[in-house]
């Protein structure tokens, strides 16, 4: 039987068919192709209208100076260029499927998957008409490629899109959505998960994460630079863009001002007796991550990674070709990255300013008129500490390109740029795997998950796993509530040596007008990180006061992490323990044994009812730390597994024979982050040994003169 639908409604009623046992049939009927295409056309109109309303809304807010922090954040997480094209296609597809389901729903009161009424040919028709199909066009790779592509394409010659930008995350376990397709758990009131009520994310944050700031424990064996490298690294490998609209596709509802729940709005509801937010009808705004076009099952929602997955310094160089070109100085043949033409930092380069038509960084200090910086990752102006890291590596690229030009006067600008880029990429890999990851995982987990490098393996999948984007947020447990700035004697400097984090977001002016990056880098080296303890998980500066200074309501980062895991359809705590081959607790006592903390186990069970439902971030950061590591068993497995895949599945990994010569590899082995700081700043005394561990001046510090420089002799062409 054919079921003919018209966009205005049903042409004829359909008798409800049931199988003999009362179950929903696998196939409801067949929809006319014209109806499928009509829904797609309507979807395109709805999506385009919502995108346009968003652009006009934020433009008005920025021009009037009334932009909220969520609007500022949107500027840094909005899909742009190729990402925007990919996201728009996925939005067309998902809205069209939703429209089809809405029109079928009156015919079938039971839950069903819309794909049950579509033929494979019609699913392909949706993929083509949305634009999703065109993201899988065949990539032709050059026969000889000495350098990475900017986009990550062709790293794997057998499967050229693996690890490339603007592709879906890989799922290590199947998605778990409330409806089996796209709706997150917690969306529909009264719908249980594994037989238990889904707790409000804000309620879990209040009950388990909250602690008084004056009880904060400083980490005696980790510098704040340990936290900062984690963020810089994360921004090299993952960016999950938020929707290009803040308005409901179907009703035009503004997600920022309304607490109603309509896609893409998934606001955090406020529990009773909240310590800060007294109006229970209020909410914390939240927007679902952009969907991705997926090749195999086009209906089960996945998310998109806007960046290359490889550890390749894409935060310096970009993950799309137009941005990469924009970041370069193409006025000469010197292979340089572009620098700021208006300001310097004590005679040293700053990054260029972005050319945003309406710049959100201008709003953080209206009299200073300092725009956002332009970098390989759009979040570089999010906080001055992050800006300092980006600036450091732009300077290092230009230093290397200049030295390589002296060694090889005949090299043209392209060759100089690519060779310097290749060295910087290797530096980020070495610092990450030699210095940073062992301090995250601890020696036992490091040996288990990241054994000695053997060789490149083209059967290893280097894509970022969806779960990793949540697991790597363990770094929020390391954050101190202040930005610290120190002078050359490592003493607090300037009128504001200790600025609350809530006052530094998007404040590019603090780098330009308040002393540059040197005091910030000293602060990162000589200040301890926060230690994650089971009763001191995340500071209130980012749990209660995130962006509160210009917003109707402060954001709660831990609660946002939990809501995000539900948005992404991530399985719960025990599913990931099983994935990692770890015991899966089922009772309070068993959970108490795993956590080595019965009181915490009781708190978690009071919220979730079962360990199966504990949000992956909450469960992960609750575990006792691995010996000499800063994560527990589960996060060590997930983080270690991801970074092994990023290493072994990278054809351009710095140790892979043929990437660098043996002599070049020997030279690169001596590089260090302290030496890079010495070479590109006015700092003359830096951390000795591992920069991520040393944190006490003068005990842990040495003169720059004692650190070996990178010898570029083996880059000289004969």
UniProtKB/Swiss-Prot annotation:
Residues where Cysteine sulfenic acid (-SOH) is found: 290
Classification via InterPro entries: Haem_peroxidase_animal, Haem_peroxidase_sf, Haem_peroxidase_sf_animal
SUPFAM superfamilies found in the cross-reference section: Heme-dependent peroxidases
Entry keyword annotation includes Ribosomal protein: no
Requisite cofactors: Ca(2+); heme b
Classification via CDD domains: myeloperoxidase_like (cd09824)
Name used for this protein in its record: Myeloperoxidase
């Amino acid at each position: 039987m054919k079921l003919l639908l018209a966009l205005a409604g049903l042409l004829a009623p359909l008798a409800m068919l049931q199988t003999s046992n009362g179950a929903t049939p696998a196939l409801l009927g067949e929809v006319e192709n014209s109806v499928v295409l009509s829904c797609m056309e309507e979807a395109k109109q709805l999506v385009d209208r919502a995108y346009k309303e968003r652009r006009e809304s934020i433009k008005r807010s920025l021009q009037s100076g009334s932009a909220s922090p969520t609007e500022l954040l949107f500027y840094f997480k909005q899909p742009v260029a190729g990402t925007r094209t990919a996201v728009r296609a996925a939005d067309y597809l998902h809205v069209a499927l939703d429209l089809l389901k809405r029109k079928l729903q009156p015919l079938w009161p039971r839950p069903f998957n819309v794909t049950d009424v579509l033929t494979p040919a019609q699913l392909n028709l949706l993929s083509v008409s949305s634009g999703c199909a065109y993201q899988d066009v065949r990539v032709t790779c050059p026969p000889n490629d000495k350098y990475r592509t900017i986009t990550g394409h062709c790293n794997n010659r057998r499967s050229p899109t693996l690890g490339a930008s603007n592709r879906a995350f890989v799922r290590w376990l199947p998605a778990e959505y409330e409806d089996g397709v796209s709706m997150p758990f917690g969306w529909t009131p009264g719908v249980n998960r594994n037989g238990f009520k889904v707790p409000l994310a804000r309620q879990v944050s209040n009950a388990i994460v909250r602690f008084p700031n004056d009880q904060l424990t400083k980490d005696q064996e980790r510098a704040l630079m340990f936290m900062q490298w984690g963020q810089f690294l994360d921004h090299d490998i993952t960016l999950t863009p938020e929707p290009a609209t803040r308005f409901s596709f179907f009703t035009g509802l503004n997600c920022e001002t309304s607490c109603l729940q309509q896609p893409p709005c998934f606001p955090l509801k406020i529990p009773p007796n909240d310590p800060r937010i007294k109006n229970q009808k209020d909410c914390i705004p939240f927007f679902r991550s952009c969907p991705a076009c997926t090749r195999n099952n086009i209906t089960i929602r996945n998310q998109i990674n806007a960046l290359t997955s490889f550890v390749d310094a894409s935060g310096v160089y970009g993950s799309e070709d137009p941005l990469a070109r924009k970041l370069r100085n193409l006025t000469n043949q010197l292979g340089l990255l572009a620098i700021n033409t208006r300001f310097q930092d004590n005679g040293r380069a700053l990054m260029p300013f972005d050319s945003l038509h309406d710049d959100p960084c201008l709003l953080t200090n209206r009299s200073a008129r300092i725009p956002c910086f332009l970098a390989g990752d759009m979040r570089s102006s999010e906080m001055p500490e992050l800006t300092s890291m980006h600036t450091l590596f732009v300077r290092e690229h230009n230093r290397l390109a200049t030295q390589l030009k002296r060694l090889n006067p005949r090299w043209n600008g392209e060759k100089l740029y690519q060779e310097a880029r290749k060295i910087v990429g290797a530096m980020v890999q070495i610092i990450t795997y030699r210095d940073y990851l062992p301090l995250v995982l601890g020696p036992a987990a490091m040996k288990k998950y990241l054994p000695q490098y053997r060789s490149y393996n083209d059967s290893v999948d280097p894509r970022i796993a969806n779960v990793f984007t949540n697991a790597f947020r363990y770094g929020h447990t390391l954050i101190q509530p202040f930005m610290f700035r120190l002078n050359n004697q490592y003493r607090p400097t300037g009128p504001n040596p200790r600025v609350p984090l809530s006052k530094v977001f998007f404040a590019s002016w603090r780098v330009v007008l308040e002393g540059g990056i040197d005091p910030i880098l000293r602060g990162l080296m000589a200040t301890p990180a926060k230690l994650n303890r089971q009763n001191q998980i995340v500071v209130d500066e980012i749990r209660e006061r995130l962006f509160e200074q210009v917003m109707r309501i402060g954001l709660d980062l831990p609660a946002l992490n939990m809501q995000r895991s539900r948005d992404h359809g991530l399985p719960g705590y025990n599913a990931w323990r099983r994935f990692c081959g770890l015991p899966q607790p089922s009772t309070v006592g068993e959970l108490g044994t795993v956590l080595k903390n019965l009181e915490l186990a009781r708190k978690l069970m009071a919220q979730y009812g079962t360990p199966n439902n504990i949000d992956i971030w909450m469960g992960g950061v609750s575990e006792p730390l691995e010996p000499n590591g800063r994560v527990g068993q589960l996060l060590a497995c997930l983080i270690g597994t991801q970074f092994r895949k990023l290493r072994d599945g990278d054809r351009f990994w710095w140790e892979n024979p043929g990437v660098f010569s043996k002599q070049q590899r020997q030279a690169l082995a001596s590089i260090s982050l302290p030496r890079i700081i010495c070479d590109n700043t006015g700092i003359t005394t830096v951390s000795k040994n591992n920069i991520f561990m040393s944190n006490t001046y003068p005990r842990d510090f040495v003169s720059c003169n004692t650190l070996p420089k990178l010898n570029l002799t083996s880059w000289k062409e004969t």
